[in-house]
Amino acid sequence: MTAAENVCYTLINVPMDSEPPSEISLKNDLEKGDVKSKTEALKKVIIMILNGEKLPGLLMTIIRFVLPLQDHTIKKLLLVFWEIVPKTTPDGRLLHEMILVCDAYRKDLQHPNEFIRGSTLRFLCKLKEAELLEPLMPAIRACLEHRHSYVRRNAVLAIYTIYRNFEHLIPDAPELIHDFLVNEKDASCKRNAFMMLIHADQDRALDYLSTCIDQVQTFGDILQLVIVELIYKVCHANPSERARFIRCIYNLLQSSSPAVKYEAAGTLVTLSSAPTAIKAAAQCYIDLIIKESDNNVKLIVLDRLVELKEHPAHERVLQDLVMDILRVLSTPDLEVRKKTLQLALDLVSSRNVEELVIVLKKEVIKTNNVSEHEDTDKYRQLLVRTLHSCSVRFPDMAANVIPVLMEFLSDSNEAAAADVLEFVREAIQRFDNLRMLIVEKMLEVFHAIKSVKIYRGALWILGEYCSTKEDIQSVMTEVRRSLGEIPIVESEIKKEAGELKPEEEITVGPVQKLVTEMGTYATQSALSSSRPTKKEEDRPPLRGFLLDGDFFVAASLATTLTKIALRYVALVQEKKKQNSFVAEAMLLMATILHLGKSSLPKKPITDDDVDRISLCLKVLSECSPLMNDIFNKECRQSLSQMLSAKLEEEKLSQKKESEKRNVTVQPDDPISFMQLTAKNEMNCKEDQFQLSLLAAMGNTQRKEAADPLASKLNKVTQLTGFSDPVYAEAYVHVNQYDIVLDVLVVNQTSDTLQNCTLELATLGDLKLVEKPSPLTLAPHDFANIKANVKVASTENGIIFGNIVYDVSGAASDRNCVVLSDIHIDIMDYIQPATCTDAEFRQMWAEFEWENKVTVNTNMTDLNDYLQHILKSTNMKCLTPEKALSGYCGFMAANLYARSIFGEDALANVSIEKPVHQGPDAAVTGHIRIRAKSQGMALSLGDKINLSQKKTSL
């Protein structure tokens, strides 16, 4: 191990504003100073030794003048000093002075103060010199019988460490600790003793557990956790022991400690696949989620349930617990609720879908009674989407869901109302038997709709699916009611003139007639020439939208009126009624056009809306069969095709997910029989405790490619040239939140290189954790240096630096070799993700940083270029494959990804292939990237530009 890899027990801040004290002044303070002076001097000595100073002349001074002191602060500092001070000569022999120190250790182990005894025992765990420990063994053994638990538990730790490092000093340690464990009452002492037996003598640990297996529930939680670990390790190594200990794990599921319950449930799942075991573990997880207040804990345990669901056999067991899982919805945290609803939706079946829908309906109603809050609105959206998915998967439920949800079309939260509208649109198209119900409920809430976007959607649905004469007449009535008195312009002018009359009689000056720009008369009061405003809330909804200048809804209304008028003509045979209805529809369109061209609206009507309304007027005036088919058949066919494509895509993604989860067994794969398996082959499964330990230490091993050239070797970066005196190359190992640089340094000269130091610096959101230690390289020798770099966000980072060294025996200045830059690839931190179209549009509007990248490539196929961008940026294409299929000379697609730091990245690809340049013309266009942070937008843009350069070569 290098110095940088050694375990560091002590970290002390070094003040940089003062000069380091001299050895003479320190010696004087240690010899003649008072307790306070000696304390300060000892602190300075410790800091200097940690900084690399030797100070051999002070060792005897400290032994003579500081070691005999009984001050507790000094005793604590001395333990640190003895830990770091060199205890051996250069040839490895123990210093003679350490014999005196050893005697001081022995006295402290027999000290009446339990803190001093315990601290000394903890210190002995760090000693690596057997000669120092040997005389202390009787005193250490005696500490096992001390009255205070602090001393006893540290004595156990000391014995365990000594036995592990120097077994010959205490060969009977397992037996000694086993006897101690049998008689011990303190929970922490028992835990340490049991932990030692697990690692030192597992058979004795199992013997002890067998004698008290029925009392495990009465033990403290720290001991229960160790027992769970032992059972897992034993059963992992020897599966035949499972039957012996599985009941103990079941009992520990009832522990009062949440940590024990969590570990016991995880162990139970790994030891048994029986439905009863899976159900017990899942029930334990659910109880933990409900009872624990920390949202992070809830999310972690929910992840365990999601992992259980991924196993096909376990999924069937979890389906019976859907209603229990829904109890988690009582948690106010949105992320927990989102994950819970997704899990419940994945597990729902025809057996429990009815109960699920009842619970979700109650939750929806609850959100209506809660005071408005951002999370409440988002939670309502989640509930609506979940009910939407349930209704699509289980059509029988749609009739129960629709009446409740349609109340929310009039909700002030447009996002929730839009989700309801999307659900209603799909339901009315898919389920013919529900069309009458949906139209009826839509007509009920139509007048209360507050959002113009929802109003447009409701108009479209009513126009498309009203099929009876009565429904058509009802739609026309609702439209007239929502539009108010017509003609709109004249009625508004009259209303304004009428509002000028005061409530009380006031003498009014002469009134003059004015001609407006539309050619109509308006009256002007002598009291005021400004137009007064009446409360806009009194206006009917549609009239209010039009006067606000939103004429897009007018174009939608014109289409709806045209559809229902054409349908009315087909249903009613009387010519008079036909003409009357068509004329009424045309009158409404004409009055809207008149309003749009007047000065009354806040914004004038656009040319597009004028064209649309004029087209509808022409269609109604001519009533051609072709237009009839387009309005009444083709529109619905387009919706049907879109919904079919969406459903097909969902089925395809579900199929891919199920294929991932299903383990395919080949016909010639060997079958493993547990009874016939050799012991050394039973450890094929990964040890979960070992994996979690590696993850905590940052040593998580990713699955590398089978070919080493395609995995590790392609991440080796050459830092210097082959002709440089020092050759260096680095393997860049990327973990989740940090980067480990494993640098190989080779001395290519015939000289000894002293103080060879790797000096690194970073650019971007990277931070060097520690400075690599200097080393000495013999001629043609090599060494590995490791450096850790922390990563805080998804930005392109650069690590640069140099190697400096001294040549042994040379009088010249320090030599320096400049290293090549190491560019950190942000693709290691970006993962493909998915979101709805509405969420994409919302984020697109909110994100302020945009990076526009111009397409510059030799590729000639639009689809190939899109796939190249997806591969280069690690993003997911949200645009359905059907929308991208075919060839029309241009393509537009939306891409989305999330970083492991929770940052969102959006991209819109807009590309085309110039037809006039022939079939070999290169793809042109641009890619717009949007992100919340500037770094993310720029980094993705750089990545795309870099990938384009490679394709252009």
UniProtKB/Swiss-Prot annotation:
Bilayer disposition of the protein: Peripheral membrane protein
Keyword Metal-binding attributed: no
Subcellular locations according to the entry: Cytoplasm; Golgi apparatus membrane; Cytoplasmic vesicle, COPI-coated vesicle membrane; Cell membrane
Post-translational modification: Proteolytically cleaved between Ser-528 and Ser-529 by CAPN8.
SUPFAM superfamilies linked to this entry: ARM repeat
Tissue occurrence: Predominantly expressed in the upper one-third of the oxyntic mucosa and in most regions of the pyloric mucosa. Ubiquitously expressed including platelet, liver, heart, spleen, lung and kidney.
Claim: Protein transport is one of the keywords in the record: yes
Alphabetized InterPro entries for the sequence: ARM-like (IPR011989), ARM-type_fold (IPR016024), Clathrin/coatomer_adapt-like_N (IPR002553), Coatomer_bsu_C (IPR011710), COPB1 (IPR016460), COPB1_appendage_platform_dom (IPR029446)
Modified sites of kind N-acetylthreonine: 2
One Gene Ontology MF term: structural molecule activity
GO biological process: intra-Golgi vesicle-mediated transport; intracellular protein transport
Gene Ontology CC terms: COPI vesicle coat; COPI-coated vesicle; cytosol; endoplasmic reticulum-Golgi intermediate compartment; Golgi apparatus; Golgi membrane; plasma membrane
N6-acetyllysine, modified sites: 494
Keywords of this entry: Acetylation, Cell membrane, Cytoplasm, Cytoplasmic vesicle, ER-Golgi transport, Golgi apparatus, Membrane, Protein transport, Repeat, Transport
Principal subcellular localisation of the protein: cytoplasm
Subunit structure: Oligomeric complex that consists of at least the alpha, beta, beta', gamma, delta, epsilon and zeta subunits. Interacts with CAPN8. Interacts with SCYL1 and PRKCE. Interacts with COPG1. Interacts with ARF1 (myristoylated); this interaction is required for binding of COPB1 to Golgi membranes. Interacts (via trunk domain) with ARF1 (via switch I region); the interaction is direct. Interacts with KCNK2 (via N-terminus); this interaction increases the channel-mediated whole cell currents and promotes plasma membrane expression of KCNK2. Interacts with STX17. Interacts with TMEM115.
Role description: The coatomer is a cytosolic protein complex that binds to dilysine motifs and reversibly associates with Golgi non-clathrin-coated vesicles, which further mediate biosynthetic protein transport from the ER, via the Golgi up to the trans Golgi network. Coatomer complex is required for budding from Golgi membranes, and is essential for the retrograde Golgi-to-ER transport of dilysine-tagged proteins.
Protein name: Coatomer subunit beta
